[in-house]
Amino acid sequence: MEERLEDEGGGRWERARRASGGRRWLGPFLVIVVVPILIGAVVALVLGRNLGFEAVRRRTVHKFPDVQWVSTAELATWREDPGRTQPLLLDARSKVEYQVSHLRDAVLDDAARPSLRPVKGLPPNNPIVVYGSVGYRGARLANWLGRQGFTNVRNLTGGIFLWANEDRPVFRDTRPVTEVHPYDHRWGLLLVSGVRAAAPDLQTPFAAP
């Protein structure tokens, strides 16, 4: 009886020792293997978005070589400068997208059906900044405005997607919000998850948003 108790006690001690040894290995395993994998996945996702924006920009510049561009940082600084003539902001997306969110004070001018109504009475050299989701539709509208005689038009690099990804303000009417219409489930991957609105895919005639 005593021997059996000793055997059982020894077995429990051995199991506890092995479990403790396993736990000692768990920390180094997480640090050496799991954490780098997770970090690598995040880095790959960020780099993938950056490459996606750059690929769209290159393609758009090739198609609309005369269009000028302005970066998100440049526009943000510009809008905070009271000594500088402020640009008219034109949203080149659809009404459905615009209603989800837009840049502050931006006026809708859908690139699929461009109109001169938003720029009526504006001097030809007045600064105008246009934007789409990622830059393509903005460039299309900027190119069209240039053909109508407007000489100071810029397209926002990365569009509202990059603007919102950088935690810059977007609005629904006059109320600050955080979400942006994703255009569709594929292009929406360029939006960070906290910014991507839940919305059905759009059907548009454009090669990119």
Where is each model-derived feature located?
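Short hydrophobic beta-strand that contains or immediately precedes a catalytic carboxylate
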Residues: 75, 87-93, 106
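Structural motif
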Residues: 88, 127-129
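Rhodanese-like catalytic fold shared by cysteine-dependent sulfurtransferases
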Residues: 2-6, 11-81, 99-126, 139-209
